[in-house]
Amino acid sequence: MQQNAPPPPPFEDGLPQECWFSVDVECSGQTPLEGSLISIGACLVDDPSRTFYIELRPDPSKAWGPKEERVHRLTRSHLESHGVDRIEGVRKFADWVRATGEAVAPESSPLFVGFNTPFDWMWLTMAFTEAGVRNPFGMSAVDLKSIYYTLHGGDNLTWKKTVKRFVLQVYPTDLVADHNALADAVEQAELARTLREVARKNRIPPTMPRGR
């Protein structure tokens, strides 16, 4: 790296914009090592009418979590009969992300938006790897819990208070999501638009360090 190079400006005109995708998954276990990815839901944050939803056949070699089933309410028998092959399904999702981004914002880069993003990202990045497809989001992801904590964090806000039921008390949405991957993704999109606007109104311009 060149020494004493002037720092780049905080923002540059003409840089590619991001195309925000709200994404949610449902699974049959806590990690990809012990369970299966069973459904993927997604929509554009700024046009939630553009949606994707798919249910996947569970991996027969993985355990099935009854605790998780009580949350997502998808039975193993239903998914075995009606689910799509998981490799095919993940490839369809990657194709949809790329095609949708190119259709609505051809100069943009897809940005993954989630609520407790590490969980959903963990499952999808493993699924993309297993399917042999490039992650359409690259390494770009946003966590709405983190944005909320940044906006409202302090001595009286612990990370445990960023669970969705508390966040929705501050920023209620018009939607009722109940662990259906698509419904959750659409609800997240509304929350993302709200938090983004709040962040814009409270934006502190970055101060770039002076060169030494």
Protein language model features and the residues they cover:
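Conserved non-catalytic scaffold segment of RNase H-like nuclease domains
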Residues: 2-118, 179
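Acidic active-site catalytic centers that drive phospho-/nucleotidyl reactions
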Residues: 24-26, 120, 143, 184
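Conserved protein kinase catalytic core
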Residues: 30-32, 149, 190
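Short, glycine/charged-enriched secondary-structure capping and boundary segments
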Residues: 36-38, 126-130
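Active-site-proximal helix-loop-helix substrate-binding element of RNase H-like nuclease domains
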Residues: 57-65, 69-72, 76-79, 142-186
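Acidic, Mg2+-coordinating catalytic module of metal-dependent nucleases/exonucleases
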Residues: 111-118, 122-123, 127-128, 160-212
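The first long alpha-helix at the start of the GST-like C-terminal all-alpha domain
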Residues: 115-117, 140, 144
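A short alpha->loop->secondary-structure connector
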Residues: 128-138
